[in-house]
Amino acid sequence: MAGNFWQSSHYLQWILDKQDLLKERQKDLKFLSEEEYWKLQIFFTNVIQALGEHLKLRQQVIATATVYFKRFYARYSLKSIDPVLMAPTCVFLASKVEEFGVVSNTRLISAATSVLKTRFSYAFPKEFPYRMNHILECEFYLLELMDCCLIVYHPYRPLLQYVQDMGQEDMLLPLAWRIVNDTYRTDLCLLYPPFMIALACLHVACVVQQKDARQWFAELSVDMEKILEIIRVILKLYEQWKNFDERKEMATILSKMPKPKPPPNSEGEQGPNGSQNSSYSQS
């Protein structure tokens, strides 16, 4: 593990340029509007969150899984691997990397099947179509894409330090923590260092709680312009989220999403060859 964030693969390889990110996304934006793509981000983050909660994983494991998911689709089109397969794959890998312990094959498939059926049936009327061999193959592609750069830094630790330094832990921490969780529904984890995201979330929490922290922020040696950029993204998320009726909209958005070849049918799932490449696309 890197001794600190500035020497880590997270900083050196996975803080991306916004223009490069948008350029990579153009293939998908031929099929989806920017707003629809944003809603897909929110939706699949919700799927990963629900999977993690079902498996009783720590929030940091869920956050790491979400970052893996975003990293993959920052480099590849949604068409390359079905996000419905990628989501549990990211949870599976993150649980190992964050030393939570390996989630057993049976539990993982059971959780994915149950969560899609009970929480997201309005978007996925059919059964979860994948089995463990698909997840293991998908994990291989995910590891290859990330070049085995698996350590992810999160805003939670710096947030805790900042709130303690400010001396307002009880008032600010619960709200700022929830805002950090919400930032994973955006691109922020791909674009900014975690400590900046933590400061932006703390700033929003201070405004909401009417805590005057101008002096505390003024004494920081940090680029406040970047903090304000992050705050604008957070506020845009809440504005868009407020008007997002997931149950009504997601089926249509998912139908427009570029897809790999159709997932295996029930007869082909157990066969050694019938479903080998059905969740992947080379184009």
Swiss-Prot record:
Component of the Mediator complex. The cylin/CDK pair formed by CCNC/CDK8 also associates with the large subunit of RNA polymerase II. This is Cyclin-C. The gene is CCNC. It comes from the Eukaryota. Disulfide bonds: none annotated. Component of the Mediator complex, a coactivator involved in regulated gene transcription of nearly all RNA polymerase II-dependent genes. Mediator functions as a bridge to convey information from gene-specific regulatory proteins to the basal RNA polymerase II transcription machinery. Mediator is recruited to promoters by direct interactions with regulatory proteins and serves as a scaffold for the assembly of a functional preinitiation complex with RNA polymerase II and the general transcription factors. The keyword Transcription regulation applies. Belongs to the cyclin family. Cyclin C subfamily. It is found in: Nucleus. GO terms for molecular function: cyclin-dependent protein serine/threonine kinase regulator activity. GO terms for cellular component: mediator complex; nucleus. CDD domains: CYCLIN_CCNC_rpt1, CYCLIN_CCNC_rpt2. Its main location: nucleus. GO terms for biological process: positive regulation of transcription by RNA polymerase II. Residues 272-283 have a biased composition (Polar residues). The keyword Thylakoid does not apply. Keywords: Activator, Cyclin, Nucleus, Repressor, Transcription, Transcription regulation. Residues 252-283 are annotated as: Disordered. PANTHER family: CYCLIN (PTHR10026). Residues 46-144 form the Cyclin N-terminal domain.
